[in-house]
């Protein structure tokens, strides 16, 4: 090697949706890691696996199984910028998960809208002041305890609304 290439970024997308190079939620975490590992055997340069990785255990497994030297976590960090801090603190259950809606890609790239995230309403708005207290608090029922429903309920409660959150399943969190 002459130093022109520092590492390989190996990514496999899907044919569902207009942004085909980004793995969507229909693929399980680390779905293409084995293929990345096979490619890694052909080089001495570091290899970065980029795909759907939500949990620290998945990233650790990919590296431990020698399928990659590094794991990209861009969408996980957009969904929750505290991802690394919470995982290092032993509190992975507090991480707001990326559910691979790919709003972060579609909104900006295809629809010409501002950058955003389906589970983190603050993504792309970090420099704006927080939303203030509601001038007229209301009673609000949020149906669905997935990440978006929980975020809506939390944001509404922070603004002073009286919130009830209903979920059909015994636990919150969605998929």
What are these regions (language model features)?
Residues 1-143, 147-163, 171-173:
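Flavin-dependent oxidoreductase catalytic cores
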